[in-house]
Amino acid sequence: MSQALTLARPYARAAFAIACEKGKCMQWSQALTFSAQVANNPIAAALLCHPQIDHEQAAALLSPEGADPAYVRFLEVIAEAHRLDVLLQVAGLYEKLRAEAEHVIKAKITSAIELAPNELNNIVTALKKRFDCEIEVTTGVDHSLIGGAVIDTGNVVIDGSIKSKLTRLQASLTH
């Protein structure tokens, strides 16, 4: 996985630089998401690896309808370098670069029960204050947490679950 990220990083940076230069960051984001999904389809992946498919045809197959010509050329470069297998990682890294540039942090909030809208708003407000940027939230429910919540922003994990508190208490009692 880390090798795929290492290979994908320069492509993601190049895509982000080109998209920003053209003022089309969101369009490229959507196009990369589409292309990564197509490339990850086993049938499409087999077709893309076929020796009779050249890099221009591969780029055409992966491009969404009406894609920016520079985006299509970007896909041609990746196909020519035989790196279509890291397109999913390119898309993920591109999204991170876009979020950083837009001062947005993506947070995953997992709680023992579904959070009420006002509870979720309170958490988002606290996260905005702590990180001084906008927060995009996805939520999930994990009953094994017993109570509380776990907030994962990618770089920071805030674990306020009862499960982790009980685990820490157990560890302190056994040592």
Swiss-Prot record:
Keyword line: ATP synthesis, Cell inner membrane, Cell membrane, CF(1), Hydrogen ion transport, Ion transport, Membrane, Transport
Membrane topology: Peripheral membrane protein
Role of this protein: F(1)F(0) ATP synthase produces ATP from ADP in the presence of a proton or sodium gradient. F-type ATPases consist of two structural domains, F(1) containing the extramembraneous catalytic core and F(0) containing the membrane proton channel, linked together by a central stalk and a peripheral stalk. During catalysis, ATP synthesis in the catalytic domain of F(1) is coupled via a rotary mechanism of the central stalk subunits to proton translocation.
Protein name (record): ATP synthase subunit delta
SUPFAM superfamilies for the chain: N-terminal domain of the delta subunit of the F1F0-ATP synthase (SSF47928)
NCBIfam families: ATP_synt_delta, PRK05758.2-2
Lineage, top ranks: Bacteria, Pseudomonadati, Pseudomonadota, Gammaproteobacteria, Lysobacterales
Subunit structure: F-type ATPases have 2 components, F(1) - the catalytic core - and F(0) - the membrane proton channel. F(1) has five subunits: alpha(3), beta(3), gamma(1), delta(1), epsilon(1). F(0) has three main subunits: a(1), b(2) and c(10-14). The alpha and beta chains form an alternating ring which encloses part of the gamma chain. F(1) is attached to F(0) by a central stalk formed by the gamma and epsilon chains, while a peripheral stalk is formed by the delta and b chains.
Subcellular location: Cell inner membrane
Family stated for the protein in its record: Belongs to the ATPase delta chain family.
GO MF annotation terms: proton-transporting ATP synthase activity, rotational mechanism
GO cellular component: plasma membrane; proton-transporting ATP synthase complex
